[in-house]
Amino acid sequence: MKSKAKVVVIGGGAVGVSMLYHLAKKGWSDVVLVERKELTSGSTWHAAGLLPLFNMSYSVGQLHKYAVNLYKTLEKETGKNVGFSVVSNIRLASTKDRMDEYHQYAGVAQTIGVNVKFLKPEQVKEIWPLCNIEGLIGAIQHPEDGYIQSADLTQALATGARNRGAEIYRNTTVVGIKETKSGWVVETDKGTIECEHVVSCSGNFARQTGEMVGLDIPVIPVEHQYIVTEPHPKIVKRKKEGLPEMGVLRDSDGRWYMREEAGGLILGPYEDGAPCCYLDGPSKDSEYELFQEDLDRLMPHIEGAYHRVPAFKEVGVKKVYNGAICYTPDGNPIVGPAWGLKNFWINEGHSFGITAAGGAGWQLAEWIIDGEPTIDMLGVEPRRYGDYATKSYLKEKNEEAYRNVFIIHYPDEERSAARPLRTAPCYERMKKLGAVFGQKFGWERANFFAIDGMEQKDDWSFRRSKWFKAVEKECKNVKENVGLLDMTAFAKCRIKGPKAETFLDYLVANKLPKKIGRINLCHALNTKGGVHSEFTIMRESEDSFYLVSAGAFQRLDHDWILKWMSKDGSVQFENLTNSVGVLVVSGPKARELMKRVSKDDFSNENFKWLSSKQINVGYAPVNAMRVNFVGELGWELHHPMEYQNHIFDKLMEAGKDLGLKPYGIRAMNSLRVEKSYKLVGTELSIEYSPYESGLDRFIHPNKGNFVGLEALNKWREKGFQNKLVTLEVHNIIDADVLGNNPIYQNGKVVGRATGGDFGFRLSKSIALGMVKPELATTGQKLKIDILGKMHDATILDESPYDPENKLLRS
């Protein structure tokens, strides 16, 4: 065993071995993998080996596409047969909403180049003659999909890694990990290995590995069962006749998958009541472990399978597998850098580990070696969770994620387990006013407010649902009167010290506000020149700055700041998120409202746009910042959390005759789209330069060096491939752009809608999207696919609502 290596990968399942393979493939041969038992002996060995390309995420979809393409080439590269059966995958639909989901997904597939076909029930019967098509309204098929032999795949990846110089140490247990000045020391029962990087691919042991370095990795496995039957005469006969294998069948509404296996069938349900396992970790001797089967949990799905595939009832059960599958609260894996640690990487929480292994290894190897991934990895970022993700929280959320694998994934879906958790002081007041809540980063946020006797409950859909009218009312009130929005979930911090200005000037691409009290919108780029973070920065004093960013990215943004911050004490960081609340007042009557609750001067002459003042609202101290995300006159009121209800009550009382009403996140989204305001993770991404995203006025390449400048200049010399535009979508009836909709010209995909909504102030359906630069001209006619229907679209000037910002500046 080596005593020194560039990278130590911990864990020898498909994910870990793929990690090793991709590091070696990119040229790092001095890499090793440590496995406590044998390769695949955790969860990989009992995996059903399915390779679903279906994923509603633009980024995760690219990872899955890469993996499937890679697996097709491994036998030629390594000489190892991976048992890849390209038999296609059919997903059945019994409801209109399910077909809407498939059409939305098909749009995503078009933007990343994945082939998907829509089938009629009769076509399903032709491909899957054992399927009862009663009650079906259609299906989708992935012709390139199928299944693979998980253990064989892992061995092929291991061969590919070894052929490039990587080494694998089996039956070697990691007993400790220590950080050093130069990197890490991994302690094993066979000796120690000094290294620069550590990658945790420990699967069911993820939490134990994390504990060795002080990390609480938000992963707990859940039990998953599948049934293998005896051979069925009809399937055996088909094989003898040389007929093609029927492929993978997924009854999404029945919540199960089925495929052929050795002349019989495999049935894998995602049932209610499946418990988390290994809450305190597997035993030290755990290897090739299965749990006692529990067929009672599966009976509703078994009976559903009897109906959909009557042949399933005609054969006996050969074997029931009940093994651990890793889960996270949202069901997506955790791939990327650990927070607060240098060169410690996480590749954990893979509930679809065989599918994800290839893509996760590919992108994480890029991240480690090149410093950044190519694909925006926000959907799988380890830093998308915070300290609120405790073990008890994970247990509830992970069990929820498991049972929801096959539910319809609506764009406005808000899952209920382990909520409410983090609440602003005004939560109960908002609730009494009709708030229907969602959550981000554990925080409860009002999505909208129920009106006119509407049930105080969400109504999920891919189309305009019951909340559409409520949001319309909120938007119009903001336009005509004044609205109140709770944004306490914002991430907030203070950067101070004698070198605070120098540090921040290097961190962001915009110039910092020069005068005390002034505010600038600033963007932090990554080292490849893509947009990493967006901050509202207010100068508090000569050497102190207040930063605000999206609440969902609190850990990500704050970790990014700390990564670049000097450790010599000349710059200090203070997280203010949990101590500072934020209420936003916006609308033409906002100034009158503020004059009623405060004695300070709110005139345009003495309180200009993009400035702030320390004021009092009632008896409470408030940092009033004249900025908002909806394009109206307004202020963000930042205040010590303990004063929030006092401020809230003062505002509501004073605003009665002004028409003051609360509004929610969905109204805010409609209002921001009309202004062409951009969001990190959609319009702003590491995949796009700030120039492509229309941030030209916020980028100052001549101000001096900043993170990403060199790469950005090279990118500009090379030429940009995209341009963000605002479009009006025509002939809309009941569905607006949701994001990831393909944009067409002359039948060819020329772009991707990043987001959209109905703009109630404009009475137009609006989309934001990336298109080829040569098409990004006002008046250009294009088409957008919305739930399978083509709609004409016209490119508008940026910020179609109040393009000169007269209202903001009034």
Q: Which residues does each predicted region cover?
A:
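Central beta-strand plus flanking loop segment that forms part of the substrate or channel wall
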Residues: 48-53, 88-91, 214-241, 300, ...
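C-terminal catalytic lobe of FAD-dependent flavoproteins
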Residues: 150, 253, 262, 284-421
